[in-house]
Amino acid sequence: MMERTYGRRKPGMLNDDVSRAEHIFPSSSSPELEPVDFSTQESSCVWNYSSRSTFSDNDFSEKRNKRPRNGGGGFGSNSTLMEAQEFGELIENEDEVNFALDGLKKGHKVRIRRAALSSLLSICESQYQRRSLRALGISQSIIDAILGLCLDDIPSNLAAATLFFVLTTDGQDDHFMESPNSIKFLVKLLRPVVSASTKVKPRNIGSRLLSIIKDVDAARDAASMHDLSSCDIIDRAQEILVNCKELRLIDSYKIERMRPELSTKWVALLVMEKACLSKISFDDTSGTVKKSGGMFKEKLRELGGLDAVFDVVMDCHTVMESWVTHDTLSVEDIKDDLNKQSLMLLLKCLKIMENATFLSTENQIHLLRLNKSMGSHESRLSFTELMISVIKILSGLQLRAHRNEKHPHPQPHLASAVKKGFVTIISSDTCSTTGFSSIKSLSVSKRNQSAFLVGCSTTPKPGSQSSVMSTIDHCTLTTTAGSNTGSFAGRLASLGSGISRSKTRTSQTRESSCKKVENFASFEDSQDPFSFDLEDSGPSRWAVGKQKKSKGQKRKGSYRDKKDERSLQLFSSQEESNHGLNSQEESSDRDHHVTEQPSLTYDIDKGCLCLLSDCLLTAVKVLMNLTNGNSVGCREVAACGGLESMAELVVGHFPSFTRSPLYSQMESGTCHQKDKHLTDQELDFLVAILGLLVNLVEKNGINRSRLAAASVPITNPEGLQDSEQDMIPLLCSIFLTNKGSADTKDETSTFTLDDEEAVLESEKEAEKMIVEAYSALLLAFLSTESRSIRNAIRDYLPKRDMAILVPVLDRFVAFHTTLDMIPPETHKVVMEVIESCKLP
């Protein structure tokens, strides 16, 4: 049997005179052995060409026929060049993995550990390489080494979390995630302990001033993330997550460099979210839906995983409370990346809670019993209270954003902005007579102007335009934290001044990406008086592609650019200080100038609103799972104000239902509300709210009475209370507005997929049927509580007849019965409600 060994070649060993035949073959005269008639890069220095001359063509063919084909190791003479190259790459990867695993052993320094993890990230970058490692049985060795790491270094933690994610979610055994070691490792990633003995370089005056504002650990963490090895790990981790389409498809964000998602907690939560997904199997023969899969959710609860996720939600809630407390946020109070990362972590935690409570009564009970103290306060907050508080905060932020989009307010003058602690951007564009001066974004605060002046470098570079600092009297700027600076804190918390991201062509934008810094540097180097505009001064993609520059040099240059930029931005974000992850905006072809007149338009950041909407929808789904067939959960949610909160969500986010006319006007055709087409996000949100209300009133008479008597205040576009809306007319309005034409339409009518109008109409009808069914079920449950409530509902229905609900409820029950998704006791209750609706 031929046995091929692989050895790492050193430079200068291509022509070495080694006994290759003895190294590869036990004996050159063995009948089992044969030379291979191809030449590759690997074989150019391995195969002994002198031994090939001892064989003739006849001998070679004779030995080839005698050789048994048992599929053993090595290559036969019929191996192709591609197969040989692939085999060489496999062996090379195996060798690289072994070297990297040696670097992960205990006792090595942090820099060695980082280098080893960076090497493993590069090896596991593509799915093909990961499959090859799994085929060789090496992936399990990598996972075992990662589970035994000491999590005392932030970059190493990020690399370990990324490797664990990509190796466990890419075809790994499902039951592997249920092991205690895996779950404990994920919990440790959510609660990392950074060693205080980590040695860092002496900090400069800027870092020392920064430590006054923040804690010493934050400054040390920032220093640990700003070296070349950390940047290399961040780049490789981001590339893997982008290739897995996690950054783009899950959070609906553009691919950016140094995104806030690139944190250890976010990746660990991502792994938990994937593992908590319950697998649903559909039986083709019976048409039933059943749950299948492992027990990761239960193991996660038993080993403290849900408690750790609850702690992360508490931290995010603390940050969100500060958004409500501060009408206008100063740069020292809340940093940009902290807000962005808080929402992203919150979304992942809510996804985990949603998946963990789905079809798991034990997890529902465990979360309902959870309560933690609120920091230094003596009061304790239960999980239900926490979720309702999160829903209220998110709803308020989203509603203010929409109001500011429709009714923007003028931006305040710079003097008032500085007085209120706004973030101010001073640009040399308006203070210099030269049109090519570079833009330097400087953060100014009221309390730390002296620290700002110390941290800024005002020495101009030779042959370049310097950034000019002027007073308010010389330069009239109109930038605020809520609109033009691009600050996430201003976009979310200072919603009274408008939510905006730095996308408007008429506003000043903070330059935070390395691409912009590189453009300025290239212009300063060229100094061509006939050069084009700044955005065209950078090298083209073809020019960059032709430059033969190593990855290390590229990362080094990028690191230096980012370091120069940080020196001009003393008050960086929380993520930059703790993790060094510099969130950068994807550059686009637009002008960046400061307007001399106040801007009256606001460009609402769609990405931020989408993130808020996702968090709000998922939080409602968590409560819906907690109350699904759980009487304790229904009592807890109702006791914490869940009924009133859901009613406020309907009124606030769907104001059109409060303005719907009476049913007589709907029948006459004067109402245009039926033509409204809900978006997928709005439809899911409305259905989740109605589903939660159905769970709350299904088996609880007290909740039925409270919901029927509820009255929700209606606010005007300025945010002031205008009137009140009773719940019964509101629910009847939802039902009548979404009542489809399924009862009158000929079911035998068909349409083709080419008919676009027919397809869209069918889609609208399907959406209406879903909302119609849940609203009808909710009205039917309320009608069974008392005669007065039943009469109140009849007053808002056509012909004062409750029988209009019966066909809708029959279709609802038939659908869920077909899929076997309705419990027997629930089916019995619904059938009794349907019979009651048939009574006069």
From Swiss-Prot:
Residues 764-819 form the WAPL domain. Keywords: Cell cycle, Cell division, Chromosome, Chromosome partition, Meiosis, Mitosis, Nucleus. GO terms for cellular component: chromosome; nucleus. SUPFAM superfamilies: ARM repeat. InterPro entries: ARM-like, ARM-type_fold, WAPL, WAPL_C. Residues 546-557 have a biased composition (Basic residues). Signal peptide: none annotated. Disruption phenotype: Plants missing both WAPL1 and WAPL2 have relatively normal growth (slightly slower) and development but exhibit a significant reduction in male and female fertility (aborted pollen and ovules prior to fertilization and embryo defects in fertilized seed), due to blocked removal of cohesin from chromosomes during meiotic prophase (late zygotene/pachytene stage) resulting in chromosome bridges, broken chromosomes and uneven chromosome segregation, and leading to shorter siliques containing fewer seeds; this double mutant restores pollen viablitity to pollen-lethal ctf7 mutation. Transmembrane segments: none annotated. Residues 1-37, 56-78, 532-594 are annotated as: Disordered. Interacts with the cohesin complex throughout the cell cycle. Belongs to the WAPL family. Regulator of sister chromatid cohesion in meiosis which negatively regulates cohesin association with chromatin, acting as an antagonist of CTF7. Cohesion ensures that chromosome partitioning is accurate in both meiotic and mitotic cells and plays an important role in DNA repair. Essential for the prophase removal of cohesin during meiosis thus determining the timely release of meiotic cohesion. Important for proper spindle attachment and assembly during meiosis. Helps to prevent abnormal centromere association during prophase I in meiocytes. Required for early embryonic patterning. This is Wings apart-like protein 2. The gene is WAPL2.
